[in-house]
Amino acid sequence: MTRKPRRRQGAREVNNKFCVLLCLYIWFKSVIPDGRDLNRMFPGSKTGSLASQVAFKLMSKIVPQVDLIIDYHTGGADRFNAPQIRIVKDEPVLDELANTFGAPFVLYSKNINKSFRNACYKIGVPILLFEGGKSFSFDKTVTNTGVNGAKRILHYLEMLNSKFKVSKPKKQPVYVSNSKWIRAKYSGMFKTTVSINTFIKKGDIIGNITDPFGKFNHFVKAEYSGYVFSVNDAPIVYKGDAIMHVSIELED
């Protein structure tokens, strides 16, 4: 069970602090120089590999001291993600925090074994996983969503200085309880024809796959109706590659 973050009582509270960790930025990826993915090494080991020791330090020195964690991620492997918060189902505390953050989508997903999110969940520390944009790419909308969401959370916890304005979300988040990837049926050059965040209907043409010589042109049709919240931006795809993530079940 996730514990509820403590609200601070006024600006006189000494421990009104938030911590920003950019420990992975120097490597530009979550794979540590020893070749291991840090996000698959939690809770870590004091005497293990470098990645395992980094995970152990986070879990033993920092995480036990905090009331709430917001973990910011971008899409990998040329995938562009719509701004979204990922949490587990049936956790009212996380639902309230995700709604306060105000990202366009809230995706219910299971915790992955040995991930940072799973390790925090096991010890009751609330964590919001933010996904948005893609690696090595700047997107103003995604950045603003992430910043504004953090400000709303700080305001909710009564930790934000009154000189900072807090904007309301333009609309309520769409809660996604189940989703599926549409996969490429052929290899070739892929170009999408739909925008992220849009609602598509089963049978809609959402892109096409061609060859370099113009002799082959396959129109990709939506296999499900739902919101598009992740798109593969890679110019070349192979048969079976995930090209578009679509919601198939929504929560009221």
Language-model features and meaning:
Residues 1-252:
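Structured catalytic-domain cores with a bias toward divalent-metal coordination
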